[in-house]
Design a protein with these regions (language model features):
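A generic local structural motif
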Residues: 19-21, 125-126
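A short hydrophobic/aromatic micro-motif that marks alpha-helical segments and, especially, helix-coil
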Residues: 10-12, 25, 131, 146
Length: 146
């Protein structure tokens, strides 16, 4: 409900996005994953990514994620976010992983908290999503806080 991108108008748009992702996997700084069930790995139910380039000056990665409504409140997103946080600390070597959510979407904040991220504050009218201009709640975890 609180996406920062427009929904795809038809399947050709989705196919184009997926082609772009596949092409970008050749880059060393592209971090985008589909979320799938282990038993049904050909059926994505969500995605998670580093949504801004990693800030090398401070070692910061900003994460964005989404999952289909039928899979809300099942711990799937927390498992995926936790795995990506560990990957970014252990394999990429970042010092800080952060994310944000629309203040009207507290369940996203609950996912972040469950993964050890700490609430850092709300930036008023600092973001835009498909609901319009919104307040953004920021969470982060540092490498030495795991």
């Amino acid at each position: 409900k609180y996406h920062t991108w427009q929904t795809h108008g038809d399947i050709s748009v989705s196919e184009g996005v997926l082609r772009e992702w596949v092409n970008n996997y050749a880059r060393n700084d592209f971090y985008q994953w589909a979320i799938v069930f282990k038993e049904y790995s050909d059926k994505p139910i969500g995605s998670i990514a580093v949504v801004e380039n990693i800030d090398e000056t401070v070692g910061k990665a900003h994460i964005g994620y989404c999952i289909g409504k039928p899979w809300w409140h099942k711990g799937i997103m927390s498992e995926a976010l936790g795995a990506v946080i560990n990957f970014l600390f252990d394999e990429v070597g970042v010092n800080r992983v952060e994310s944000r959510h629309d203040q009207r979407n507290p369940n996203s904040g609950a996912v972040m908290k469950k993964c050890g991220m700490k609430f850092e504050g709300t930036l008023r009218q600092s973001d835009r999503n498909n609901q319009g201009i919104c307040d953004a709640c920021y969470y982060a975890i540092l490498a030495d806080e795991r």
